[in-house]
Amino acid sequence: MKPPVNQSCQHYPECAGCDRLHIGYEKQLQHKQEEIEKRFKGFKGLEIRQIIKSPKDQMYRHKVQLPFGHRKIGKKSVLTLGLHNKENTFIIDQKECRIQDEDLTTVAAAIRHWARNENLEPYHEKKGSGLLRHIVLRKANATQEILVGIVTNESEIPGRKKLTDRLYSYIQQFLYKENSKADVVGILQNVNRKNTKVVLGEKEVTWYGRHFVKEKIGKLDFQIGLSTFFQVNPFQIENLYNLILEDLPENKCVVDAYCGIGTISLYIASKSKKVIGLEENSSSIRSAIGASKANGIENVHFIKGKVLDTLRAALNENSDVVVLDPPREGLDAETKSILLNSKVNQILYVSCNPETLLRDAIELTKSFKYEKITPVDLFPHTSHLESVSVFTK
């Protein structure tokens, strides 16, 4: 294999965070365009549009999840904080990152410094022991607010008040040295005692400030917590959502399936007669309802429950259009069956996985015409690819 060219990160290619950093960005876009064209060329009459590049291709990630680890230096074990290597055998002690926001890299360095100075033990997955499991950091692009999450293996931590004060102090010092204008508005402890690969647990304790950052999409205000689903590349959100808006017919009843905190529902509300958002996560539904009230939007209604359990009833509300934004697994067979047998005239499908989109598109074209697909690069320097597809009757 040829050695990487244009290498611009000391951890590449060992780090598993990026897999295309050695390729120029324009060439990456070309490869992703070709991937979509090759994968979807079998659909007759399908318009495959040009990929939408990210306005920012470096330091674009405004959410960071990093595991704690340890490495041996002589006979001494030293705490590390970073990403897994590609073989998933150890944690790289991250010194830089070309895709995550600079302020979040600075905050991560401050947390590492704090953890080492306090002699806090990293979590040992095989033993199930140790305190520190992960950090989860979020930054709001509009307000420059930062939320810090420390995921622990224990609920009660002796001397928590002093630990919090010193952590906050270190973070402020590190940000000040970098002339950062970011504002740390909250430090949270998330407790996860399960032997699991899932990062966040269910219990959350506020150590300092509040449990969310304030973010904007266009003129809309949202509150983003540690576990909130929100696009990690804020520079592409409006480009993505405008594709939905562009093909959405005016004054129709719309079902927004997998709506999360209601970002799409509220973004398309001004063009719609009514929007029904479906979401199974209780916290997300509460946030969505709160956001609709805060933004003074009255033609959006949110229903808690799995899409499979709520979609049929929502479609009976004389719905004309369905917006889909499922997880990487795509749609289950029964959900597709409900859509195929519905009176819906249009489906707008936001996908983060071309493989499952292809599988679902083959099924959906039994009743719908696959009109167009627009790839959107939300994740430069990685193989991940988002897209918006339009299906009509």
Curated annotation (Swiss-Prot):
<feature type="binding site">
    <location>
        <position position="279"/>
    </location>
    <ligand>
        <name>S-adenosyl-L-methionine</name>
    </ligand>
</feature>
<keyword id="KW-0408">Iron</keyword>
<keyword id="KW-0479">Metal-binding</keyword>
<feature type="active site" description="Nucleophile">
    <location>
        <position position="352"/>
    </location>
</feature>
<dbReference type="GO" id="GO:0070475">
    <property type="term" value="P:rRNA base methylation"/>
</dbReference>
<feature type="binding site">
    <location>
        <position position="15"/>
    </location>
    <ligand>
        <name>[4Fe-4S] cluster</name>
    </ligand>
</feature>
<feature type="binding site">
    <location>
        <position position="258"/>
    </location>
    <ligand>
        <name>S-adenosyl-L-methionine</name>
    </ligand>
</feature>
<keyword id="KW-0411">Iron-sulfur</keyword>
<comment type="similarity">
    <text>Belongs to the class I-like SAM-binding methyltransferase superfamily. RNA M5U methyltransferase family.</text>
</comment>
<feature type="binding site">
    <location>
        <position position="231"/>
    </location>
    <ligand>
        <name>S-adenosyl-L-methionine</name>
    </ligand>
</feature>
<keyword id="KW-0808">Transferase</keyword>
<dbReference type="InterPro" id="IPR030391">
    <property type="entry name" value="MeTrfase_TrmA_CS"/>
</dbReference>
<feature type="binding site">
    <location>
        <position position="325"/>
    </location>
    <ligand>
        <name>S-adenosyl-L-methionine</name>
    </ligand>
</feature>
<protein>
    <recommendedName>
        <fullName>Uncharacterized RNA methyltransferase LA_0292</fullName>
        <ecNumber>2.1.1.-</ecNumber>
    </recommendedName>
</protein>
<dbReference type="InterPro" id="IPR029063">
    <property type="entry name" value="SAM-dependent_MTases_sf"/>
</dbReference>
<feature type="binding site">
    <location>
        <position position="97"/>
    </location>
    <ligand>
        <name>[4Fe-4S] cluster</name>
    </ligand>
</feature>
<dbReference type="GO" id="GO:0046872">
    <property type="term" value="F:metal ion binding"/>
</dbReference>
<keyword id="KW-0489">Methyltransferase</keyword>
<dbReference type="InterPro" id="IPR030390">
    <property type="entry name" value="MeTrfase_TrmA_AS"/>
</dbReference>
<feature type="binding site">
    <location>
        <position position="18"/>
    </location>
    <ligand>
        <name>[4Fe-4S] cluster</name>
    </ligand>
</feature>
<dbReference type="GO" id="GO:0051539">
    <property type="term" value="F:4 iron, 4 sulfur cluster binding"/>
</dbReference>
<feature type="binding site">
    <location>
        <position position="9"/>
    </location>
    <ligand>
        <name>[4Fe-4S] cluster</name>
    </ligand>
</feature>
<dbReference type="GO" id="GO:0070041">
    <property type="term" value="F:rRNA (uridine-C5-)-methyltransferase activity"/>
</dbReference>
<keyword id="KW-0949">S-adenosyl-L-methionine</keyword>
<keyword id="KW-0004">4Fe-4S</keyword>
<dbReference type="Pfam" id="PF05958">
    <property type="entry name" value="tRNA_U5-meth_tr"/>
</dbReference>
<dbReference type="InterPro" id="IPR010280">
    <property type="entry name" value="U5_MeTrfase_fam"/>
</dbReference>
